[in-house]
Structure formats: C-alpha cells, structure tokens
C-alpha cells in the first residue's frame, strides 16, 4: 500500500508540473497575440505596450515556476 501512495505522489507532482507548463504556454500565447494586436492598431504605443507586456509576462510565468518548485519538492523531499 505504501508503494501505491508513493506512485500517486509522483503522478501528482508530474501532473502539477505539466499542467503548470501548459497553462503558462497558453497564457503567454494569448498575451503575445494581444500585444501584437495592440501594436498593429496603435503603433505609437509600442514602447508602453512592450513594458506592460513584459511585466505581465513575468507575472504569468511566475505561477508555473512556483508550481514546478512545489512539484520537485513533492517528488524529491516528500516522496523520495
């Protein structure tokens, strides 16, 4: 029974990291598309849009990095 619990912890950690990567890629893809759309509509605002784009992209990318850290913690500290 203990092996089953360990296997479930590994599966949970892998799903956590995988879903975080999928969510980040979808979020950054949508964000990049909206940035290009805004730059095409208002070329004069590209510097402002670029600054806001990188700030929001960093925030969108921070959550999956936290999930990857938690997933690795579960894999190596809790399950290992």
UniProtKB/Swiss-Prot annotation:
InterPro entries xref list: ATP_synth_csu_bac/chlpt (IPR005953), ATP_synth_F0_csu (IPR000454), ATP_synth_F0_csu_DDCD_BS (IPR020537), ATP_synth_F0_csu_sf (IPR038662), ATPase_proteolipid_c-like_dom (IPR002379), F/V-ATP_Csub_sf (IPR035921)
Organism listed in the record: Aeromonas hydrophila subsp. hydrophila (strain ATCC 7966 / DSM 30187 / BCRC 13018 / CCUG 14551 / JCM 1027 / KCTC 2358 / NCIMB 9240 / NCTC 8049)
Protein family per UniProt: Belongs to the ATPase C chain family.
Keyword Cell division in record: no
Keywords: ATP synthesis, Cell inner membrane, Cell membrane, CF(0), Hydrogen ion transport, Ion transport, Lipid-binding, Membrane, Transmembrane, Transmembrane helix, Transport
Subunit-level organization: F-type ATPases have 2 components, F(1) - the catalytic core - and F(0) - the membrane proton channel. F(1) has five subunits: alpha(3), beta(3), gamma(1), delta(1), epsilon(1). F(0) has three main subunits: a(1), b(2) and c(10-14). The alpha and beta chains form an alternating ring which encloses part of the gamma chain. F(1) is attached to F(0) by a central stalk formed by the gamma and epsilon chains, while a peripheral stalk is formed by the delta and b chains.
Protein name, per record: ATP synthase subunit c
Listed HAMAP family: ATP_synth_c_bact
Superkingdom of source: Bacteria
Gene it is expressed from: atpE
Site (Reversibly protonated during proton transport): 61
Molecular function terms from GO: lipid binding; proton-transporting ATP synthase activity, rotational mechanism
Subcellular location: Cell inner membrane
Bilayer disposition of the protein: Multi-pass membrane protein
Functional description taken from the UniProt entry: F(1)F(0) ATP synthase produces ATP from ADP in the presence of a proton or sodium gradient. F-type ATPases consist of two structural domains, F(1) containing the extramembraneous catalytic core and F(0) containing the membrane proton channel, linked together by a central stalk and a peripheral stalk. During catalysis, ATP synthesis in the catalytic domain of F(1) is coupled via a rotary mechanism of the central stalk subunits to proton translocation.
A GO cellular-component term linked to this record: proton-transporting two-sector ATPase complex, proton-transporting domain
